[in-house]
């Protein structure tokens, strides 16, 4: 480093070694950071990191792809910066840590954008063309945003799920799981969005409050005699009445086909003014009170006794088409927490309902499904045909009332399923879909998909650890995976289906490979334009192309297949070392990736999962437009610098919510300023130091320098253990403490006298600089993962011949002899120094002294304290920053103490110490003897400090 003395200032009569540095005090981050981003791109720094890391053990953090739609938000910034910190830390630790960013490109959000811009009547080929163009534009915008945050990666070669190779890879993954026997077609209730016109994945469902009408409805007796016998009666006292259900979905009543009771719950036959009512015994009092009637229990029976009884549909008297009966089935899922203890069953619109009816022998063809994909009833449905189910709710309530079967209705606020895109209510709807069976045993294993996935979870490391139980519970309880979607912009389930039987073509696996080859060349458009005769010849008369597309969670969930081992197999590898996403991805990408890898490989695609929380404001509230509490990372970068966002993320415990506000950013900015000032001090005092010319061997270092380097080496070992566990907030906290207390509050404070006043090339000063050189090397590398711009800026000043700090590895410190003993000794000395500092402050408050250099101290110490202090000799005063220090040995701790004496000597003009020899030199009457020696003689000698 070159000597940068402040030439603009007039030359002092007795100069000190006060050096300058081109590393400025002010970061000016909003202006400088974009210059570094441009510089990294132009100099191809990521490629140079790869070249420097070639041949090392790989570390693969596989990027969970953000959706290619819209500007990046603060959640994106948290996610990408956490990934960037880990990748940089792993590279510095000596790994070949590759980072290939990716994007999720297919699916509803982009299709909606195309519909908004161009309408809904575009042909499929044009939808795909415009969707590709839109996704490409969004990717470029997001890419620029991520680069601006200081994230280094293979931005020129990212993976995109819409790349032809990746689309083809998905089709091949589908073929593989079909070959193993996981895929089947069936009628099942699935999450259905009317606005999407498609099934939804579990991860695409969110819950919001919704107000619905609840109804208590009576299904009248169809066979009074059997009902009487079930309750142990010879006959019913009268035949009026029935069994009562409670539901929050009146729109499902037209499709009712059964009633469900718990086999062990006791049910009561109650005589009331509305007839004989069957209710769960423990719900009788609450129900009758809500109906405003009195009643008497005349018989009871467990649910098991009532199995297979039949009751009339509650609209039977309203229209002939409802003149049917509903049987009683038993189900363990029925409870008495709310309602009547009886559940009405519409198998097309409820998972338990469907399972119960199928278990009792109901055929798919017998299941009533009057609700169409757009949320309207089929025109042929009596009384309500053509109505939206939500509009039909009040009309159904009215019809039940007129039929005499409505006992009660009220408005009910409850948490209800909504589409995450449209924010509109969704339903369960039985449709014919393609599924991956959770409880299917493939033809190459004796374990079901669920069992394989759960075993995989046990073998995975989780950060934080609670993520394991969360994912385990989700997999343990989830239904079969609905793979199919009814959309255009997605990877096709490229099957040929028999027009009459619905069976797949016998050559399906072979045909999927043929389609994949075409998609690899021309994209998924190749399936749209494919003439079936090209592949199946005359069979095209009997088969039609399946129009379903794959769930977009299959797109991203198979990136371990078509990216790690496909489009980017040369850069990446399977399994990945780490997947890192927000906590919502336990039911999203973590989840779908686990299932696909369990099917394809019998193991998870990752060795570890890291979960981070969501951003909230300073009061812990979720960020939203309505609250106006959102924080835009682009705005913060332009106002304060991306480095402040990075430092905020690194200093926050990401395992919980990440709170941010202007006040928090202000505190982070102040923390950054203190770190920057520490770096500036180090760089300034190393600006005339050349390691090749000026370095001193460890054996010649002053004792405090050996201590400081040993302390920094210990800090590095501690911090690297945190980096290994992906813990960043302890790293920041310990570095901040080190900079402010160990360096600023102690070592650098003590060092200033030696750096500034001893001869420029003296052993004492070069010893200090050699220590500072190692400390600077260590600190810059330790900070580089999170303070990326600042570390690089400081590095280019510190090591201008080096291309970038990111091709380095963590600093190798020289071995300090007897480091442990040294650390213990100086821990004790610093404790004494704290006592002295307190005594000096008391003297200052009492106006006994001004600065600490105006004081001399006498320390009474016993045992090890005395020995440690005495070992420093004349250098003790430099450690205490006083003009004199003496140590008096005492016998016990009780006698220990500090006396502060105001110095009676004159102050040296140059070093500001009060010394007896100031004025003894006629030639330099304002200087002390050591300054005269340091300036004009052989220089002072120091051994400890």
From Swiss-Prot:
GO function term, MF aspect, one: isoleucine-tRNA ligase activity
Location(s), subcellular: Cytoplasm
Keywords: Aminoacyl-tRNA synthetase, ATP-binding, Cytoplasm, Ligase, Metal-binding, Nucleotide-binding, Protein biosynthesis, Zinc
Protein name (record): Isoleucine--tRNA ligase
Subunit architecture: Monomer.
GO cellular component entries: cytosol
Residues the entry annotates as binding Zn(2+): 908, 911, 928, 931
UniProt xrefs under CDD domains: Anticodon_Ia_Ile_BEm (cd07960), IleRS_core (cd00818)
Cofactor(s) this protein cannot do without: Zn(2+)
Cofactor note: Binds 1 zinc ion per subunit.
Keyword Transmembrane helix: no
Entry similarity comment: Belongs to the class-I aminoacyl-tRNA synthetase family. IleS type 1 subfamily.
Domain notes: IleRS has two distinct active sites: one for aminoacylation and one for editing. The misactivated valine is translocated from the active site to the editing site, which sterically excludes the correctly activated isoleucine. The single editing site contains two valyl binding pockets, one specific for each substrate (Val-AMP or Val-tRNA(Ile)).
UniProt motif 'HIGH' region: location: 66-76
NCBIfam families, per database record: ileS
Primary subcellular site in the record, as a coarse category: cytoplasm
